[in-house]
Amino acid sequence: IENFGKIDGLVNNAANNPKVEESSDKNFSRLENFPLNIWNNDIAVGLTGAFLCSKYYGEKIAQNPDGGSIVNISSDLGLIAPDQRLYKKDGIPENLQNVKPVTYSVVKTGLIGLTRYLATYWADKNVRCNALCPGGVENGQPDDFLREVSKRIPMGRMANSDEYQGALLWMLSNASSYLNGAIVPVDGGRTAW
């Protein structure tokens, strides 16, 4: 703010995507074994962090005559539950099977609630708040995982890392000046089913 005189956009994109350690007799990604300290840390980073940034910078944006935009980066897993079948491996006992940890979806769903709250809170100051809900990005996952997840996406593939930029730039820009409180999935159609 000191360098530019004002702030007119905020992107809340901090999150943990927990990779939880296993032991010989437990898989800590599983709900019944999930450590409370990891729960607290993931909520603090992903949800409390977005709240604090929105609280501080949203007030600054609200002081601008033209307002501005807050975009919370949620996920398709904030709209739908993770398909835990994607993480299963043959020959591994149930209690040791990997799953998508609970906190990722909880944080991403919480961001949708925060988005809706903020969309109404500062609307009279022309501060818009929307959520971008990207699907998964292909980034070196095992071939069997990519094959299975692609079957669940109408476009038949995961996203490339640069395929969310256009939607994010649009949501931050004046081209979306009447978009407020929107939850925008960019997921190849995965949540359309």
Language model: regions and residue ranges:
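Conserved NAD(P)H cofactor-binding loop of Rossmann-fold oxidoreductase domains
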Residues: 13-27, 189
